Structures are given as C-alpha cells and as structure tokens.
Amino acid sequence: MKLLMTGLLASAAVAAAQEQQVLQAEGSAQQQPAPSIFDETLKQFESGLEEGITHFWSEMKTNFKHYLPLISVPKEHTRRADSEWDHVVRGADVESVWVQGANGEKHREIDGKLQSYDLRVKAVDPAELGIDPGVKQYSGYLDDNETDKHLFYWFFESRNDPKNDPVVLWLNGGPGCSSLTGLFLELGPATIDKNLKIVPNPYSWNSNASVIFLDQPVNVGFSYSGSSVSDTVAAGKDIYALLTLFFKQFPEYATQDFHISGESYAGHYIPVFASEILSHKNTNINLKSVLIGNGLTDPLTQYPQYRPMACGDGGYPAVLDQGTCRSMDNSLERCLSLIETCYSSESAWVCVPAAMYCNSAIIGPYQQTGMNPYDVRSKCEDMSSLCYPQLNTITEWLNQKSVMKALGVEVESYESCNGGINRDFLFHGDWMKPYHRLVPSLLEKIPVLIYAGDADFICNWLGNLAWTNALEWPGHKKFADAKMNDLKIVDNKSKGKKIGQVKSSGNFTFMRIFGAGHMVPLNQPEASLEFFNRWLRGEWR
C-alpha cells in the first residue's frame, strides 16, 4: 500500500515503547541491560560522529530495552509438502544448465545464485474465490531454503491477450505493506465490499497485462521467515530468483515484455530490483521499463517539499498555520545536513538519526493535525487502518480459512501492513539512503516513469518533480527544461478529459495526476489505467 506512518516519527517509536511499558502490570517491567555489542560498536563510532548523532545513540542505548519489542518477529506457519503443489521449480536445476554460445564457448543458460531457491506453484481456481472468472491464476511461494525465507505471490493473467500482453510485477511500499492491499484496494481485478462480497474492477491493470502481486520483504502479508530482511538491497536477489524461476516454469510469459511497478517505498525497492536484474547478462527476464508511483527515492531533494505541500503551495489549501510552516522552515537546514551526512556514509549510525529527526520535525507537524497524510483533502478517521477502513475488510476476507486454503497459504493469519518490518528498515538506516543514484544507470538501458497523485502529502508530487528535475544524468538539462503538457484521456468514452500533466525527455518521464492521493488507482481508476496502458504500449518512451 503506502509509506507507513509507523516509522515516520521519532515520537512514534518512543510512544510505542511507552505504551508497551504502560500495558505491563505494575512492577513487572524487566530492566534489561543493552547488549554489550551495542556499547562496543557505539564506542568505536563515537570519535567519528558529530555531537548530536552521538547523543541520539546514547539515548537509544539507555532506552534500548523499549525498542526490542518493536522489532518484527517470525510468523506462525505450517509448510505444506511439495507433493501438494502443482509445480515445484528447483533453482539448483536451473543453475546447473549450461549452453554453448555462437563462438563455441560454454556459459550458464541463466545467471545468478539460484541453488538455494525453489518456487512452488498452485493453480488457483477463479470460480472458487469468485475473482476474475475465466482468467488463469497462480499463487505460491518463493523459498530460500538457506535462509528460511518464503515470499508469497499471486499471479493474474491478462484479461485481453495473454499470449502477447506484457507481464508486470506490482510492489506495495511501507516498508512492510502487503501487495495484496494494492490488489484489492487499488489496481487488481476485484475489490471487497463491507459484506465481504467480491466486486469486479473494470479498471484493473490486468485488463491488458498479466500482473504478479508479491508480498515482500519476508513476514509481510502471507510471506514468512524465521529471519528478517531489513534493507532494500538484501531483498533484490530474492526478486531476481522469483522472476527467474517463475519464467522458467512458464516460458510462455518469458518472451513478453516485463515491467516493474510499485508505489511509495517502492521508490527505494524498484531502482535496486531493476539494477539487480540488469546486472545479469544471461537472463530470462525481459525487463523493458519501471514505473514508480508517489515514491520515496531521493529524500535530500524531496524533504524540502513537505512544507510547501502542507502550507498551500501544492495546489490545495494549506493544512498548517503560518507559525507551524515557519517552524518547519527553521528545522529544514538541520534535517538536510543530517541527510547529506547519511548520503556520504550510508551508515545506519548516521542514517537512523537523519530519519528520526527529519520525520519528527518535517513530517510530524502534519500528522498532529489529524489530516490524512495520504490525501490532503480529507481527515484521517482511523489511524489504525492507515486512514482507509477498507483495509479492515480486505484483511477480514483474506483471513478466511477458505481463502487461505484456496491460495495455498502457509501462515496462520494475514495483516495488511507489518509495523515491525517498517521499524526494522528504519533502524537499519534504509529510510534515508540515496537509492536515486541507481536511476541514471537504469536510464541508460530502460525507460523510467515517475508518476504522482497531486493530493498526496507523504510522497508528494512537488518532491517527486523536484528530484526528477535535479537528477544528474546525461539527459538532465533536456528533461529539466521540458515543459509540462496536458495529459488527456484518448482511449475511451471520456476522450479529451484532462487527467494530469506530463513531461518527458529521453528515457525519463514524470506525470502529475490530478485529484489523486498516495494511491492513484484508488482515487482515479480510469486515469490510472489510461496512462498505464499507454506507457506499456510505448508512448513517452
């Protein structure tokens, strides 16, 4: 779904720790000393850290016992026997295949370390769940048997021409939000009503493409593990293995164009995942482009745009008063200095304080208003459902035993977003890292689309426009100088309707989508399918 507010504020972590303490019976709080490795590592780094960062980590050490309950824990699960699956693809078998090149040299048919991976596949009966009857579906798990990681996926074939239509991987953000929220809340073939009934979605992205929805990293949605993944780079090799084994099992899709799409924290994921795929010479993944919606990709350039978006300069009325806006301005210099230090070292020891300070000083004032951080036009009625009560309905439907059985699910329960994963990534310094630095190398090989609903605060269109204009790459000047043009519907009965603005140069495209919040397909389903279809057909690239 979205960039989780759980990890956004320094006060959020502290509040959670305090709440944990309050809920304990009086006198039951256990005083646990911080692990000695924490003291030793901090001592090694103290000489190189500025005073403010050293003070931050000293406080963390003092309160370390409060943060331990916040780290994600493994899920209860029962692994089904391989004989219960329709297909099992062994990574070791794929890795063992060698072929002879045109000049007689031998090389592996498919690159990558695949030996520890398996892919389990179940053919899902559409009639059993009532979702997209007549459309071929598969679900299952990618297993990394070496590290006990199991990623859940759900594949929907194109409604139109699956033999020729492209294949798209969809990733939600968080970090820690299930891509099944994107399936049922945004762009999948169906939604769930309050009576737990299936409602078909005429604007599903599988109208003209086959779509894979993936729960990642581990312990998100229906995925599980005895260990954890706490940074974006660590997840990249899993994605490569999943796609490689999936296309090996289903070669009919491997020859078609493949695209990676996602939103929010996928602004971190996608540059890394695409770079991992493109780093392999011999592969069965035909990657043609990437699409990032309302993403967090370059914090140093995006964070200065929070104040303008909250204070009336983003096309919507101001949410904050002038005094609060001035306070955000006063905090910005310190915030940017911390992010610059993070960019220089990429060490958690400086990246964590940068995220904690900036999220508290720059994003915190907005959250305190009670407005929806994902849509400046509305209040947040229920923060426990991330301001979208529909998530509760989706979660209830997916937790039905009949649904889990039909999908081959191996965990005991489903939750839409895992706050523990969010905090894991935050406290490992992943939040503020400069993943935008990977984009120039992507642009050398494939087109990149950055789109943004213009009513979102948390990954707002101003910040996304700013970082795309600022990105250093050979086509920088032409892109930055390109004018924004009207984006209009051309594909259906709404032909001529203005849905946003677009600018494009070389392999780089930016879109502003009018009247949409953080989740563009939710607020503007017709507009989202319009630009999605046209992008896949090659327009603007």
Swiss-Prot record:
Glycans are attached at N208, N507. Keywords: Carboxypeptidase, Disulfide bond, Glycoprotein, Hydrolase, Protease, Signal, Vacuole, Zymogen. Its EC number is 3.4.16.5. InterPro entries: AB_hydrolase_fold, Peptidase_S10, Ser_caboxypep_ser_AS. SUPFAM superfamilies: alpha/beta-Hydrolases (SSF53474). GO terms for molecular function: serine-type carboxypeptidase activity. Residues 18-122 form a propeptide. It comes from the Eukaryota. It is found in: Vacuole. Its main location: other. GO terms for cellular component: fungal-type vacuole. GO terms for biological process: proteolysis. It catalyses: Release of a C-terminal amino acid with broad specificity. The active site is at S264, D456, H518. It holds the Pfam family Peptidase_S10. Disulfide bonds join C177-C417, C311-C325, C335-C358, C342-C351, C380-C387. Residues 1-17 form the signal peptide. Belongs to the peptidase S10 family. Vacuolar carboxypeptidase involved in degradation of small peptides. Digests preferentially peptides containing an aliphatic or hydrophobic residue in P1' position, as well as methionine, leucine or phenylalanine in P1 position of ester substrate. This is Carboxypeptidase Y homolog A. The lineage of its organism: Eukaryota, Fungi, Dikarya, Ascomycota, Pezizomycotina.
